[in-house]
Amino acid sequence: MTALTHPSIPTTTSAVPHGLRLVGAGTRLWRVVDRAGRVVGHIQTSEEADALRFHALRYSARIRRFLEVGRFWSLDDAVSCLHYVR
């Protein structure tokens, strides 16, 4: 197993913009949680063309799966997307 290390990837619970925080949910997956503890969405990482991409995901109860709402070059942009999509 390879560990993904990158300066912009949080390794523990981290504070991010808009009063949200990240909680680890897997090797390349974080829950984005608001101040009240509600899950706003998820951030998933992938490596594409020697660069790291951040995928903003929202769960749709109607179709019972995650939908990608955007791909970003920065973690802050992905979190901002989830903040404004709610």
Predicted features, each with a name:
Residues M1-R35, R62-V69:
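Negatively charged, low-complexity tracts enriched in Asp/Glu with abundant Ser/Thr
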Residues T2, H18-L20, D50, H55, ...:
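Intrinsic-disorder/low-complexity peptide segments enriched for small residues
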Residues S8, L29, V39, D50, ...:
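A broad, structure-centric signal for solvent-exposed, well-ordered loop/edge residues
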Residues R31, H42-T45, R86:
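Functionally constrained cores in energy, signaling, and assembly domains
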Residues V40-R65:
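Short aromatic-glycine-(Arg/Gly/Cys) micro-motifs in beta-strand/loop hairpins
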Residues Y59-R65, G70-R86:
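A short, charged, amphipathic alpha-helix used as a generic interaction element across diverse proteins
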